[in-house]
Curated annotation (Swiss-Prot):
It comes from the Bacteria. It catalyses: D-maltose(out) + N(pros)-phospho-L-histidyl-[protein] = alpha-maltose 6'-phosphate(in) + L-histidyl-[protein]. Its EC number is 2.7.1.208. This is PTS system maltose-specific EIICB component. Keywords: Cell membrane, Kinase, Membrane, Phosphotransferase system, Sugar transport, Transferase, Transmembrane, Transmembrane helix, Transport. It holds the Pfam family PTS_EIIC. GO terms for molecular function: kinase activity; protein-N(PI)-phosphohistidine-sugar phosphotransferase activity; protein-phosphocysteine-sugar phosphotransferase activity. The EIIC domain type-1 forms the PTS system translocation channel and contains the specific substrate-binding site. The PTS EIIB type-1 domain is phosphorylated by phospho-EIIA on a cysteinyl residue. Then, it transfers the phosphoryl group to the sugar substrate concomitantly with the sugar uptake processed by the PTS EIIC type-1 domain. It is found in: Cell membrane.
């Protein structure tokens, strides 16, 4: 059950990967339309402003079509076969569901307490999805419907029908079944969701009122649950869902950047919900402190090697906000250190929130700069000065706390391991190429294919693998016999940052190239 929950959580990350670039475009466009910074150039009737307005509207694509992206994205990770067809089925069924909801509320809206004559948005509980006026179920509805379609797809896509009904096989069969299932679901949603919307409104008020305590708990859970893969369920309702802001913090913040840039009111007063998106500060300020502590406490003869390991993963965490490569270098060595990391991350976010820092800062430096500092520094500069000062203070706190704990408890962090060589059955890439009669001067693609093959071998071979999926940085694999899987040292030798083991379920921490690695692994498995 835990494995299924983890896979479901990782599936939500597929569309999330699209938000980074879109956020940068919106942030830069807002900056170049800001009258305070650009002066006469920011005249709405001028060519400069109009050009950036056009560019900005393109950047809004993923924010304005979030439910559609989640409906299409879920099958990419969860469909076990014919993922492209599963995406088409999910989109078709999701639109069908919304047409049913729209029709039901148009005919019987009074019975369900919904007035379809209202304008969409605001407190109406209504929205437009692909031109359909329907209940605003946000990404929750999209994920729910898409998950049903994926279940039906995995179960019935290959079902053989009589020859005279052959035209209804495959995707058509899934859509047919789903069509009739959507009718009672649409009825149920039309009855239940207005009550849920009322509850969400109360939840938003409660979480905002919880203030610093709520921010601490949220940030702590977002960090501490990373090893389980369940952290997706913590941040997604806040960042992309309606837990504290209509449309999610990402969308709401981007929509109001222009307004905030023109206001002299404190940011915390303008958008108190922004305290629930400060968890990226631990990536920008906390990780450097951890990395420095690892380097300082490493053995003298291993410092150069440790620096080579830490510099790229630290920069990845700071700039892109991807922390798993460095966090997994010490998570399994010392879970206690990871718990300390979660406590410090939560405390940093809370202190910043109490100092008036809010915004969309769940990622790395790119997100902080383009969606916060650049567009808003002109009118809220001191807020970000406080943020940087607090952040650098916590960099020092991280360093001294981690250094003390590593030395006090003699923790075998990178560069402090015992010099023991583990024997492995896995042959090297060179030996593999020789066995395959391949030229040593292989292309990058061929080398990547070799690595994929070696990962398969490390996981017990093709016959031992039953399922392969991925999230942002992890290759998630189910195997028949976990005893055939090689030790972690083998995976690290291949370039992995670590391995999470949970019975027959394995998560190989590869990094941002994991989607390409999954494709290569699947290609080899299907040969």
């Amino acid at each position: 059950m835990m494995q299924k929950i983890q896979r479901f959580g990782s599936a939500m990350f597929v569309p999330v990967l699209l938000f980074a670039f879109a956020g940068i475009i919106v942030g830069i466009s807002t900056l170049f339309k800001n009258k305070t910074l650009m002066g006469p150039l920011a005249d709405p009737d001028g060519f400069w402003y109009q050009c950036w307005y056009i560019i900005e509207q393109g950047g809004w694509t993923v924010f304005n079509q979030m439910p559609l992206l989640f409906a299409i994205g879920i099958p990419v990770a969860l469909a076990k076969k014919a993922q492209a067809r599963a995406c088409l089925e999910a989109l078709t069924v999701y639109l069908t569901f919304n047409y049913f909801v729209s029709a039901i509320l148009t005919v019987w809206g009074g019975a369900f307490g919904v007035d379809m004559n209202q304008e969409v948005g605001g407190t109406s509980g209504l929205t437009m999805i692909a031109g359909i006026k329907t209940l605003d179920t946000n990404i929750i509805g999209a994920i729910f419907i898409s998950s049903i379609v994926v279940f039906l797809h995995n179960r019935y896509f290959d079902k053989k029908l009589p020859d005279f009904l052959g035209i209804f096989q495959g995707s058509t069969y899934i859509v047919m079944i789903s069509f009739f299932i959507m009718i009672p679901i649409a009825l149920a949603v039309s009855y239940i969701w207005p009550m849920v919307q009322s509850g969400i409104g109360s939840l938003q008020s409660f979480l905002v009122a919880s203030g610093a305590v709520g921010v601490w708990i949220y940030t702590f859970l977002e960090r501490i649950l990373i090893p389980t893969g369940l952290h997706h369920f913590i941040y997604t309702p806040f960042i992309y869902g309606p837990a504290v802001a209509e449309g999610g913090i990402v969308t709401y913040w981007a929509q109001h950047l222009g307004e905030y840039s023109q206001s002299a009111k404190p940011l915390k007063e303008l958008f108190p919900q922004g305290g629930f998106a400060l968890h990226g500060n631990s990536k920008i300020f906390g990780i450097p402190g951890i990395a420095l502590a690892f380097y300082v406490t490493a053995k003298k003869e291993k410092k150069k090697l440790v620096a080579g390991l830490l510099i790229p993963v630290t920069l990845t965490a700071i700039v892109a906000g991807i922390t798993e490569p460095i966090e997994f270098t010490f998570l399994f060595i010392s879970p206690f250190l990871f718990a300390v990391h979660a406590v410090l991350a939560a405390t940093m976010s809370t202190v910043m929130y109490m100092a008036g820092v809010v915004g969309n800062m769940g990622g790395g430096l790119i997100e902080a700069v383009t969606l916060n500092w650049i567009p808003l520094f002109g009118s809220h500069g001191m807020t970000y000065v406080y943020q940087i000062l607090i952040g650098l203070s916590f960099t020092a706190i991280y360093f001294f706390v981690f250094r003390f704990l590593i030395l006090k408890f003699n923790i075998a962090t990178p560069g402090r391991e015992k010099d023991e060589q583990q024997e492995t059955k896995l042959y090297s890439k060179k030996e593999y190429r020789e066995r395959k009669n391949k030229d040593e001067t292989a292309s990058a693609a061929e080398t990547a294919d070799d690595t994929a093959f070696l990962y398969i071998e490390a996981l017990g071979g093709k016959d031992n693998i039953t399922e392969v999926t991925n999230c942002a940085t992890r290759l998630r694999v189910s195997v028949k016999d976990e005893t055939k899987v090689e030790p972690d040292s083998v995976f690290r030798a291949l370039g992995a940052h670590g391995v999470v083991r949970n019975g027959k379920a394995f998560q190989v921490i590869i990094g941002l190239s994991v989607p390409q690695m999954r494709e290569r692994v699947e290609k080899i498995l299907n040969q």
